[in-house]
Protein backbone atom coordinates (compact mmCIF):
# COMPACT_ATOMS: atom_id res chain seq x y z
CA UNK A 1 0.00 0.00 0.00
CA UNK A 2 2.79 2.41 0.85
CA UNK A 3 4.57 1.49 -2.35
CA UNK A 4 1.50 2.45 -4.35
CA UNK A 5 1.35 5.85 -2.67
CA UNK A 6 5.00 6.45 -3.43
CA UNK A 7 4.43 5.61 -7.09
CA UNK A 8 1.43 7.91 -7.30
CA UNK A 9 3.31 10.78 -5.69
CA UNK A 10 6.19 10.29 -8.07
CA UNK A 11 3.84 10.38 -11.06
CA UNK A 12 2.17 13.54 -9.78
CA UNK A 13 5.48 15.34 -9.33
CA UNK A 14 6.62 14.37 -12.80
CA UNK A 15 3.44 15.61 -14.39
CA UNK A 16 3.73 18.95 -12.62
CA UNK A 17 7.37 19.29 -13.65
CA UNK A 18 6.63 18.49 -17.28
CA UNK A 19 3.72 20.94 -17.27
CA UNK A 20 6.03 23.68 -16.00
CA UNK A 21 8.64 22.83 -18.64
CA UNK A 22 6.04 23.14 -21.36
CA UNK A 23 4.87 26.55 -20.18
CA UNK A 24 5.07 29.51 -22.56
CA UNK A 25 5.94 27.51 -25.67
CA UNK A 26 4.49 29.57 -28.53
CA UNK A 27 3.48 28.36 -31.97
CA UNK A 28 2.83 30.51 -35.01
CA UNK A 29 -0.90 30.67 -35.74
CA UNK A 30 -1.60 32.88 -38.75
CA UNK A 31 -1.72 36.43 -40.08
CA UNK A 32 -4.81 38.38 -39.01
CA UNK A 33 -6.11 41.85 -39.70
CA UNK A 34 -4.88 44.43 -37.20
CA UNK A 35 -8.38 45.80 -36.66
CA UNK A 36 -9.74 42.34 -35.81
CA UNK A 37 -6.97 41.67 -33.29
CA UNK A 38 -7.56 45.01 -31.57
CA UNK A 39 -11.23 44.08 -31.12
CA UNK A 40 -10.20 41.14 -28.94
CA UNK A 41 -9.02 43.55 -26.24
CA UNK A 42 -5.37 42.50 -26.19
CA UNK A 43 -2.94 44.41 -23.99
CA UNK A 44 -0.60 46.75 -25.86
CA UNK A 45 3.02 46.39 -24.65
CA UNK A 46 4.33 49.38 -26.58
CA UNK A 47 6.99 49.88 -29.24
CA UNK A 48 10.51 48.51 -28.80
CA UNK A 49 13.44 49.64 -30.95
CA UNK A 50 14.94 46.14 -31.12
CA UNK A 51 11.70 44.19 -31.29
CA UNK A 52 11.73 40.46 -32.07
CA UNK A 53 9.35 37.53 -31.74
CA UNK A 54 11.11 36.08 -28.71
CA UNK A 55 11.29 39.47 -26.97
CA UNK A 56 7.54 40.03 -27.34
CA UNK A 57 6.83 36.51 -26.08
CA UNK A 58 9.02 37.09 -23.02
CA UNK A 59 7.08 40.27 -22.32
CA UNK A 60 3.84 38.24 -22.18
CA UNK A 61 4.40 35.39 -19.72
CA UNK A 62 1.37 33.14 -19.24
CA UNK A 63 -0.63 34.84 -22.01
CA UNK A 64 -2.47 32.70 -24.55
CA UNK A 65 -2.10 34.97 -27.60
CA UNK A 66 0.82 37.14 -28.71
CA UNK A 67 0.58 39.46 -31.75
CA UNK A 68 3.28 41.60 -33.41
CA UNK A 69 2.50 44.70 -35.47
CA UNK A 70 4.52 46.63 -38.07
CA UNK A 71 7.95 45.41 -36.90
CA UNK A 72 7.98 47.09 -33.48
CA UNK A 73 4.56 46.75 -31.78
CA UNK A 74 3.62 43.98 -29.35
CA UNK A 75 0.17 42.83 -28.15
CA UNK A 76 -0.75 39.96 -25.83
CA UNK A 77 -3.70 38.55 -23.92
CA UNK A 78 -7.06 37.02 -24.83
CA UNK A 79 -7.65 33.34 -25.44
CA UNK A 80 -7.13 30.88 -28.25
CA UNK A 81 -10.88 30.35 -28.65
CA UNK A 82 -11.34 34.01 -29.65
CA UNK A 83 -9.25 33.46 -32.77
CA UNK A 84 -11.77 30.98 -34.16
CA UNK A 85 -14.20 33.73 -35.06
CA UNK A 86 -11.56 35.76 -36.94
CA UNK A 87 -10.69 35.49 -40.60
CA UNK A 88 -7.13 34.91 -41.65
CA UNK A 89 -5.54 37.19 -44.24
CA UNK A 90 -2.81 36.56 -46.78
CA UNK A 91 0.65 36.16 -45.26
CA UNK A 92 2.05 38.70 -47.73
CA UNK A 93 0.45 41.43 -45.62
CA UNK A 94 2.69 40.40 -42.69
CA UNK A 95 5.97 41.00 -44.50
CA UNK A 96 7.59 43.66 -42.27
CA UNK A 97 10.84 42.41 -40.72
CA UNK A 98 11.39 42.70 -37.00
CA UNK A 99 13.42 45.75 -35.95
CA UNK A 100 15.73 43.75 -33.72
CA UNK A 101 15.93 40.53 -35.75
CA UNK A 102 15.42 41.03 -39.51
CA UNK A 103 15.29 37.29 -40.17
CA UNK A 104 11.72 37.13 -38.82
CA UNK A 105 8.56 39.01 -39.71
CA UNK A 106 6.71 41.02 -37.09
CA UNK A 107 3.38 41.75 -38.78
CA UNK A 108 2.71 44.47 -41.30
CA UNK A 109 1.29 47.95 -41.61
CA UNK A 110 -2.30 46.63 -41.49
CA UNK A 111 -1.92 43.06 -40.22
CA UNK A 112 -0.43 41.18 -37.29
CA UNK A 113 1.45 37.93 -36.91
CA UNK A 114 -0.24 35.89 -34.16
CA UNK A 115 1.41 33.27 -31.95
CA UNK A 116 -0.47 31.02 -29.51
CA UNK A 117 0.74 29.52 -26.27
CA UNK A 118 0.87 25.72 -26.46
CA UNK A 119 0.14 25.34 -22.76
CA UNK A 120 -2.98 27.46 -23.07
CA UNK A 121 -4.22 25.51 -26.08
CA UNK A 122 -3.76 22.11 -24.49
CA UNK A 123 -5.39 23.25 -21.27
CA UNK A 124 -8.72 23.26 -23.10
CA UNK A 125 -8.56 19.51 -23.69
CA UNK A 126 -9.42 16.99 -21.01
CA UNK A 127 -9.07 13.23 -21.01
CA UNK A 128 -10.24 10.86 -18.36
CA UNK A 129 -9.90 7.16 -17.94
CA UNK A 130 -11.89 5.14 -15.53
CA UNK A 131 -11.16 1.54 -14.86
CA UNK A 132 -12.98 -0.55 -12.40
CA UNK A 133 -12.41 -4.12 -11.52
CA UNK A 134 -14.61 -6.01 -9.21
CA UNK A 135 -14.14 -9.52 -8.07
CA UNK A 136 -16.57 -11.44 -5.96
CA UNK A 137 -15.70 -14.72 -4.39
CA UNK A 138 -18.03 -16.85 -2.32
CA UNK A 139 -17.79 -20.21 -0.68
CA UNK A 140 -19.42 -22.13 2.06
CA UNK A 141 -17.82 -19.85 4.62
CA UNK A 142 -19.06 -16.70 2.78
CA UNK A 143 -15.66 -14.93 2.53
CA UNK A 144 -15.52 -12.25 -0.17
CA UNK A 145 -12.97 -9.77 -1.46
CA UNK A 146 -13.53 -6.72 -3.65
CA UNK A 147 -10.98 -4.46 -5.31
CA UNK A 148 -11.85 -1.23 -7.10
CA UNK A 149 -9.38 1.07 -8.88
CA UNK A 150 -10.07 4.38 -10.56
CA UNK A 151 -7.57 6.52 -12.47
CA UNK A 152 -8.30 10.04 -13.73
CA UNK A 153 -5.73 11.66 -16.00
CA UNK A 154 -5.50 15.32 -16.99
CA UNK A 155 -2.77 17.49 -18.48
CA UNK A 156 -1.82 19.14 -15.23
CA UNK A 157 -2.90 16.86 -12.39
CA UNK A 158 -3.20 13.15 -11.83
CA UNK A 159 -5.08 11.38 -9.10
CA UNK A 160 -5.48 7.75 -8.30
CA UNK A 161 -7.30 5.99 -5.55
CA UNK A 162 -7.46 2.35 -4.61
CA UNK A 163 -9.92 0.87 -2.20
CA UNK A 164 -9.46 -2.63 -1.03
CA UNK A 165 -11.25 -4.63 1.58
CA UNK A 166 -10.74 -8.22 2.59
CA UNK A 167 -11.56 -10.37 5.53
CA UNK A 168 -10.01 -13.60 6.61
CA UNK A 169 -9.50 -15.09 10.02
CA UNK A 170 -8.16 -18.50 9.34
CA UNK A 171 -4.89 -20.18 8.73
CA UNK A 172 -4.44 -20.61 5.01
CA UNK A 173 -2.25 -22.61 2.70
CA UNK A 174 -1.76 -21.61 -0.94
CA UNK A 175 -2.67 -24.37 -3.29
CA UNK A 176 -3.00 -22.68 -6.67
CA UNK A 177 -2.80 -19.23 -8.21
CA UNK A 178 -3.64 -17.52 -11.45
CA UNK A 179 -2.53 -14.11 -12.66
CA UNK A 180 -4.24 -11.75 -15.04
CA UNK A 181 -2.54 -8.56 -16.31
CA UNK A 182 -4.46 -5.68 -17.80
CA UNK A 183 -2.49 -2.82 -19.37
CA UNK A 184 -3.96 0.58 -20.04
CA UNK A 185 -1.97 3.44 -21.46
CA UNK A 186 -2.88 7.02 -22.12
CA UNK A 187 -0.73 9.65 -23.75
CA UNK A 188 -1.00 13.37 -24.17
CA UNK A 189 1.02 15.65 -26.41
CA UNK A 190 1.75 19.29 -25.90
CA UNK A 191 1.28 20.23 -29.53
CA UNK A 192 -2.40 19.44 -30.18
CA UNK A 193 -5.41 17.53 -28.93
CA UNK A 194 -6.00 13.82 -29.34
CA UNK A 195 -8.40 14.31 -32.26
CA UNK A 196 -7.20 16.04 -35.46
CA UNK A 197 -9.42 17.14 -38.30
CA UNK A 198 -8.57 19.22 -41.34
CA UNK A 199 -11.85 20.76 -42.41
CA UNK A 200 -14.47 19.29 -40.13
CA UNK A 201 -15.64 20.34 -36.71
CA UNK A 202 -15.62 18.23 -33.58
CA UNK A 203 -17.65 18.78 -30.49
CA UNK A 204 -16.85 15.76 -28.36
CA UNK A 205 -15.49 12.29 -28.75
CA UNK A 206 -16.22 9.48 -26.37
CA UNK A 207 -15.10 5.90 -26.58
CA UNK A 208 -16.10 3.25 -24.15
CA UNK A 209 -15.05 -0.33 -24.05
CA UNK A 210 -15.99 -2.91 -21.58
CA UNK A 211 -15.04 -6.51 -21.24
CA UNK A 212 -16.84 -8.49 -18.64
CA UNK A 213 -15.86 -12.00 -17.85
CA UNK A 214 -17.38 -14.50 -15.52
CA UNK A 215 -15.70 -17.54 -14.14
CA UNK A 216 -17.40 -20.08 -11.92
CA UNK A 217 -16.12 -23.15 -10.19
CA UNK A 218 -17.43 -25.60 -7.65
CA UNK A 219 -15.81 -27.85 -5.12
CA UNK A 220 -16.90 -30.70 -2.89
CA UNK A 221 -17.93 -28.21 -0.29
CA UNK A 222 -20.32 -26.58 -2.78
CA UNK A 223 -18.29 -23.36 -2.97
CA UNK A 224 -18.40 -21.11 -6.01
CA UNK A 225 -16.38 -18.15 -7.25
CA UNK A 226 -17.24 -15.41 -9.70
CA UNK A 227 -14.89 -12.80 -11.12
CA UNK A 228 -16.09 -9.75 -12.99
CA UNK A 229 -13.82 -7.13 -14.53
CA UNK A 230 -14.96 -3.99 -16.29
CA UNK A 231 -12.77 -1.31 -17.86
CA UNK A 232 -14.12 1.92 -19.24
CA UNK A 233 -12.08 4.59 -20.95
CA UNK A 234 -13.51 7.87 -22.07
CA UNK A 235 -11.97 10.97 -23.53
CA UNK A 236 -13.63 14.19 -24.49
CA UNK A 237 -12.63 17.51 -25.98
CA UNK A 238 -14.56 20.58 -24.92
CA UNK A 239 -14.44 24.16 -26.11
CA UNK A 240 -16.23 27.41 -25.46
CA UNK A 241 -17.49 27.42 -29.03
CA UNK A 242 -19.87 24.91 -30.50
CA UNK A 243 -17.45 23.99 -33.26
CA UNK A 244 -13.69 23.72 -33.46
CA UNK A 245 -11.83 24.49 -36.68
CA UNK A 246 -8.51 22.78 -37.27
CA UNK A 247 -7.86 23.81 -40.86
CA UNK A 248 -4.37 25.18 -40.17
CA UNK A 249 -1.35 22.99 -39.72
CA UNK A 250 0.80 24.16 -36.87
CA UNK A 251 4.57 23.93 -36.70
CA UNK A 252 6.32 23.17 -33.45
CA UNK A 253 10.13 23.28 -33.53
CA UNK A 254 10.43 21.50 -30.23
CA UNK A 255 7.54 19.53 -28.78
CA UNK A 256 7.43 17.01 -25.99
CA UNK A 257 5.17 13.97 -26.05
CA UNK A 258 4.11 12.60 -22.69
CA UNK A 259 3.07 8.99 -22.36
CA UNK A 260 1.52 7.50 -19.25
CA UNK A 261 1.25 3.74 -19.08
CA UNK A 262 -0.67 2.02 -16.29
CA UNK A 263 -0.42 -1.71 -15.66
CA UNK A 264 -2.94 -3.63 -13.60
CA UNK A 265 -1.94 -7.02 -12.25
CA UNK A 266 -4.66 -9.16 -10.73
CA UNK A 267 -3.62 -12.27 -8.86
CA UNK A 268 -6.15 -14.86 -7.71
CA UNK A 269 -4.86 -17.01 -4.89
CA UNK A 270 -6.67 -20.18 -3.91
CA UNK A 271 -6.34 -21.00 -0.25
CA UNK A 272 -7.48 -24.08 1.62
CA UNK A 273 -8.65 -23.42 5.15
CA UNK A 274 -9.25 -26.18 7.68
CA UNK A 275 -11.53 -25.38 10.58
CA UNK A 276 -10.56 -26.76 13.93
CA UNK A 277 -14.14 -27.24 15.03
CA UNK A 278 -15.44 -29.79 12.60
CA UNK A 279 -12.27 -30.55 10.59
CA UNK A 280 -14.04 -29.50 7.37
CA UNK A 281 -11.93 -28.05 4.57
CA UNK A 282 -13.00 -24.80 2.90
CA UNK A 283 -11.56 -23.11 -0.18
CA UNK A 284 -11.20 -19.31 -0.31
CA UNK A 285 -10.33 -17.29 -3.40
CA UNK A 286 -8.41 -14.08 -2.67
CA UNK A 287 -7.87 -11.45 -5.35
CA UNK A 288 -4.94 -9.02 -5.21
CA UNK A 289 -4.56 -6.17 -7.67
CA UNK A 290 -1.33 -4.18 -8.12
CA UNK A 291 -1.16 -0.89 -10.02
CA UNK A 292 2.06 0.26 -11.70
CA UNK A 293 2.22 3.57 -13.57
CA UNK A 294 5.06 4.59 -15.88
CA UNK A 295 5.57 8.08 -17.29
CA UNK A 296 7.71 8.45 -20.41
CA UNK A 297 8.69 11.73 -22.08
CA UNK A 298 9.78 11.83 -25.70
CA UNK A 299 11.21 14.94 -27.36
CA UNK A 300 10.71 15.28 -31.07
CA UNK A 301 11.16 17.98 -33.65
CA UNK A 302 8.49 18.54 -36.27
CA UNK A 303 8.24 21.05 -39.07
CA UNK A 304 5.38 21.88 -41.40
CA UNK A 305 4.37 24.52 -43.88
CA UNK A 306 1.67 27.12 -43.39
CA UNK A 307 0.34 28.54 -46.67
CA UNK A 308 3.63 27.68 -48.35
CA UNK A 309 5.73 29.58 -45.80
CA UNK A 310 7.91 28.07 -43.10
CA UNK A 311 7.55 29.48 -39.61
CA UNK A 312 9.01 28.78 -36.19
CA UNK A 313 7.83 29.53 -32.69
CA UNK A 314 11.08 30.86 -31.29
CA UNK A 315 14.34 31.96 -32.85
CA UNK A 316 17.51 30.14 -32.01
CA UNK A 317 19.77 33.11 -32.80
CA UNK A 318 20.65 36.12 -30.73
CA UNK A 319 18.06 38.79 -30.16
CA UNK A 320 18.52 42.38 -31.21
CA UNK A 321 19.35 43.51 -27.69
CA UNK A 322 22.11 40.92 -27.41
CA UNK A 323 23.61 42.00 -30.74
CA UNK A 324 23.55 45.64 -29.68
CA UNK A 325 25.25 44.73 -26.41
CA UNK A 326 28.01 42.88 -28.24
CA UNK A 327 28.62 45.84 -30.55
CA UNK A 328 28.76 48.30 -27.65
CA UNK A 329 31.16 46.04 -25.75
CA UNK A 330 33.52 45.75 -28.72
CA UNK A 331 33.55 49.52 -29.28
CA UNK A 332 34.19 50.26 -25.59
CA UNK A 333 37.00 47.69 -25.47
CA UNK A 334 38.69 49.19 -28.53
CA UNK A 335 38.51 52.72 -27.10
CA UNK A 336 39.94 51.50 -23.79
CA UNK A 337 42.89 49.82 -25.55
CA UNK A 338 43.64 52.96 -27.58
CA UNK A 339 43.52 55.13 -24.45
CA UNK A 340 45.87 52.75 -22.65
CA UNK A 341 48.35 52.79 -25.55
CA UNK A 342 48.30 56.62 -25.69
CA UNK A 343 48.85 56.88 -21.94
CA UNK A 344 51.83 54.50 -22.13
CA UNK A 345 53.39 56.50 -24.99
CA UNK A 346 53.10 59.82 -23.12
CA UNK A 347 54.43 58.29 -19.90
CA UNK A 348 57.44 56.80 -21.65
CA UNK A 349 58.25 60.10 -23.37
CA UNK A 350 58.10 62.03 -20.10
CA UNK A 351 60.30 59.47 -18.41
CA UNK A 352 62.95 59.75 -21.10
CA UNK A 353 62.92 63.54 -20.89
CA UNK A 354 63.29 63.46 -17.10
CA UNK A 355 66.37 61.20 -17.36
CA UNK A 356 68.17 63.55 -19.84
CA UNK A 357 71.23 65.28 -18.26
CA UNK A 358 71.42 69.02 -18.94
CA UNK A 359 75.09 70.01 -19.31
CA UNK A 360 74.21 73.69 -18.96
CA UNK A 361 72.94 73.03 -15.43
CA UNK A 362 75.83 70.80 -14.34
CA UNK A 363 78.82 72.54 -15.93
CA UNK A 364 79.36 74.75 -12.87
CA UNK A 365 80.35 71.60 -11.02
CA UNK A 366 83.00 70.88 -13.69
CA UNK A 367 85.24 73.98 -13.79
CA UNK A 368 87.94 72.17 -15.80
CA UNK A 369 85.71 70.94 -18.59
CA UNK A 370 87.06 71.61 -22.02
CA UNK A 371 85.45 74.69 -23.52
CA UNK A 372 83.81 75.96 -20.29
CA UNK A 373 84.78 79.22 -18.67
CA UNK A 374 86.39 79.14 -15.26
CA UNK A 375 83.97 79.65 -12.38
CA UNK A 376 86.44 82.08 -10.73
CA UNK A 377 88.54 83.57 -13.55
CA UNK A 378 91.62 85.67 -12.89
CA UNK A 379 91.25 89.03 -14.58
CA UNK A 380 94.52 89.86 -16.37
CA UNK A 381 96.01 93.34 -15.83
CA UNK A 382 95.93 95.93 -18.55
CA UNK A 383 98.47 95.71 -21.32
CA UNK A 384 99.40 99.37 -20.71
CA UNK A 385 100.96 98.56 -17.36
CA UNK A 386 104.71 99.15 -17.26
CA UNK A 387 105.44 96.16 -15.15
CA UNK A 388 103.33 93.48 -16.81
CA UNK A 389 103.66 91.78 -20.15
CA UNK A 390 101.94 88.59 -21.09
CA UNK A 391 104.39 86.03 -22.39
CA UNK A 392 103.27 84.06 -25.37
CA UNK A 393 104.38 80.90 -27.06
CA UNK A 394 103.48 82.04 -30.54
CA UNK A 395 103.60 85.21 -32.48
CA UNK A 396 100.03 86.48 -32.89
CA UNK A 397 98.53 89.83 -33.58
CA UNK A 398 97.68 90.44 -29.92
CA UNK A 399 101.15 89.51 -28.74
CA UNK A 400 103.37 91.45 -31.15
CA UNK A 401 105.04 93.42 -28.32
CA UNK A 402 105.85 90.40 -26.27
CA UNK A 403 108.91 89.45 -28.28
CA UNK A 404 110.88 92.61 -27.49
CA UNK A 405 109.68 92.73 -23.94
CA UNK A 406 110.47 89.10 -23.34
CA UNK A 407 113.93 89.67 -24.82
CA UNK A 408 114.87 91.99 -21.97
CA UNK A 409 115.04 89.01 -19.67
CA UNK A 410 118.47 87.60 -19.19
CA UNK A 411 117.72 84.00 -19.89
CA UNK A 412 120.32 81.56 -18.73
CA UNK A 413 122.52 80.09 -21.38
CA UNK A 414 124.77 77.11 -21.48
CA UNK A 415 128.25 78.59 -21.73
CA UNK A 416 131.39 76.57 -21.68
CA UNK A 417 131.95 77.82 -18.18
CA UNK A 418 129.22 75.46 -16.87
CA UNK A 419 127.48 76.33 -13.59
CA UNK A 420 128.93 79.84 -13.29
CA UNK A 421 126.80 81.19 -16.10
CA UNK A 422 123.65 79.53 -14.77
CA UNK A 423 124.02 80.98 -11.30
CA UNK A 424 124.85 84.38 -12.73
CA UNK A 425 121.70 84.41 -14.84
CA UNK A 426 119.57 83.34 -11.88
CA UNK A 427 120.95 86.03 -9.62
CA UNK A 428 120.40 88.64 -12.30
CA UNK A 429 116.76 87.73 -12.78
CA UNK A 430 115.81 87.40 -9.11
CA UNK A 431 115.39 91.15 -8.76
CA UNK A 432 113.04 91.30 -11.79
CA UNK A 433 110.78 88.41 -10.77
CA UNK A 434 109.42 90.28 -7.77
CA UNK A 435 107.76 92.82 -10.07
CA UNK A 436 105.49 90.23 -11.74
CA UNK A 437 102.43 88.43 -10.33
CA UNK A 438 102.12 84.67 -10.16
CA UNK A 439 102.64 83.05 -13.52
CA UNK A 440 100.35 80.08 -12.73
CA UNK A 441 97.67 81.44 -14.98
CA UNK A 442 95.76 80.21 -17.96
CA UNK A 443 95.71 82.67 -20.79
CA UNK A 444 92.25 83.91 -21.87
CA UNK A 445 90.89 82.76 -25.26
CA UNK A 446 91.06 86.26 -26.72
CA UNK A 447 94.84 86.15 -26.85
CA UNK A 448 94.88 83.27 -29.36
CA UNK A 449 92.12 84.49 -31.66
CA UNK A 450 89.42 82.55 -29.81
CA UNK A 451 91.34 79.25 -29.68
CA UNK A 452 91.63 78.09 -26.09
CA UNK A 453 95.11 77.04 -25.04
CA UNK A 454 96.56 75.98 -21.74
CA UNK A 455 100.03 76.36 -20.35
CA UNK A 456 102.09 73.21 -20.64
CA UNK A 457 104.53 74.35 -17.96
CA UNK A 458 105.27 77.34 -15.74
CA UNK A 459 107.29 80.34 -16.90
CA UNK A 460 110.18 79.80 -14.45
CA UNK A 461 110.77 76.36 -15.91
CA UNK A 462 110.76 77.83 -19.40
CA UNK A 463 113.16 80.64 -18.56
CA UNK A 464 115.60 78.48 -16.67
CA UNK A 465 115.31 75.65 -19.21
CA UNK A 466 115.34 73.02 -16.55
CA UNK A 467 115.22 69.89 -18.56
CA UNK A 468 114.65 66.44 -17.19
CA UNK A 469 117.52 63.99 -17.50
CA UNK A 470 117.87 60.29 -16.82
CA UNK A 471 120.17 59.84 -13.85
CA UNK A 472 121.85 56.60 -12.76
CA UNK A 473 120.84 55.94 -9.14
CA UNK A 474 124.19 54.27 -8.41
CA UNK A 475 126.13 57.43 -9.22
CA UNK A 476 123.84 59.80 -7.34
CA UNK A 477 124.94 58.71 -3.84
CA UNK A 478 128.66 58.95 -4.67
CA UNK A 479 128.38 62.42 -6.12
CA UNK A 480 126.20 63.94 -3.41
CA UNK A 481 129.09 65.10 -1.20
CA UNK A 482 131.20 66.58 -3.95
CA UNK A 483 128.27 68.30 -5.53
CA UNK A 484 127.28 69.90 -2.26
CA UNK A 485 130.76 71.30 -1.61
CA UNK A 486 131.19 72.46 -5.18
CA UNK A 487 127.82 74.06 -5.11
CA UNK A 488 128.60 76.07 -2.02
CA UNK A 489 131.84 77.34 -3.47
CA UNK A 490 130.22 78.23 -6.73
CA UNK A 491 127.42 80.05 -4.93
CA UNK A 492 129.90 82.17 -2.96
CA UNK A 493 131.83 83.05 -6.10
CA UNK A 494 128.65 83.97 -7.95
CA UNK A 495 127.49 86.13 -5.07
CA UNK A 496 130.71 88.08 -5.03
CA UNK A 497 130.61 88.62 -8.76
CA UNK A 498 127.00 89.73 -8.62
CA UNK A 499 127.71 92.28 -5.94
CA UNK A 500 130.57 93.69 -7.92
CA UNK A 501 128.39 94.05 -10.99
CA UNK A 502 125.73 95.89 -9.05
CA UNK A 503 128.24 98.44 -7.93
UniProtKB/Swiss-Prot annotation:
SMART domains: WSC. It is a single-pass membrane protein. The modification Phosphothreonine is found at residue 402. One of its GO terms (molecular function) is transmembrane signaling receptor activity. PROSITE patterns: WSC (PS51212). Residues 124-260, 470-503 are annotated as: Disordered. N-glycosylated. One of its GO terms (biological process) is fungal-type cell wall organization. Residues 25-118 form the WSC domain. Residues 24-325 are extracellular. Residues 1-23 form the signal peptide. It is found in: Cell membrane. This is Cell wall integrity and stress response component 2. It comes from Saccharomyces cerevisiae (strain ATCC 204508 / S288c) (Baker's yeast). The lineage of its organism: Eukaryota, Fungi, Dikarya, Ascomycota, Saccharomycotina. The gene is WSC2.
Amino acid sequence: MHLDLIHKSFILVWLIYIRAALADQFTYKACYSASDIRKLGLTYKGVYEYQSVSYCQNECPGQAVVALFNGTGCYCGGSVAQLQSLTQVDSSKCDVSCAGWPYQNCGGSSAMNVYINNAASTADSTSSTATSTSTTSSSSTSVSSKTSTKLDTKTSTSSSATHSSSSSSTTSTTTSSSETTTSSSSSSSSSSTSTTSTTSTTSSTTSTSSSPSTTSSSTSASSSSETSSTQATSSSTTSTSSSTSTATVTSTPSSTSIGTSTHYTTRVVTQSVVSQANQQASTIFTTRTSVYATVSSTSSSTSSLLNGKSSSSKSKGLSGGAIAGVVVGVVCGTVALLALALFFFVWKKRRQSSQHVDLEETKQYQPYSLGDADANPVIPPSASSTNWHIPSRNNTALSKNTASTFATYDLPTRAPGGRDSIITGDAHNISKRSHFPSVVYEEPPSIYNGNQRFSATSLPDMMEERQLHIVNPDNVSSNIGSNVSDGDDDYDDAKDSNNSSLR
